[in-house]
Amino acid sequence: ERMLKRISFQTAYSLGENLAATCLDLAWHKISEEEVPSPYMAGAFEKEELHNIGLLNTQIPPRYSTSYFNHVWGGGYAAGYYSYLWTEVLAVNIADYFAKHGALDPAVGQAFRDKILSRGNTKDQMEMFTDFTGMEKPDASGFLKARGL
């Protein structure tokens, strides 16, 4: 039981780090050019944003601080760090769909191929998700369960 609690704590802490990084990434991209703080005030901006969302931990510095968090600044990932967690939520929901409807059923596999895989980036991802699962939006509870929370 103690071991399971420890695993849950580590998982929750890791998710907190990812959520903090996601929110920090989005915070930098939602402000106007005039609101961008000077480089000397970037740390204060970061602390204020993390405090406002309840993810500021004064004892442990953030894993992804603004000064070295490359996803914030470019490489095709700007304001996109959230996509790591979001795709995990979608993947868990799709896995649940397979589990409920027969993971080895050829018709289910063909529907997945036709409604998601063959579409690539030609259709909105949420439309493809809804077309396949019948769900208007993903359920986060499966994601949390998969994370042991």
Label every PLM stretch briefly.
Residues 1-149:
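Cation-handling catalytic/transport regions enriched in His/Asp/Glu
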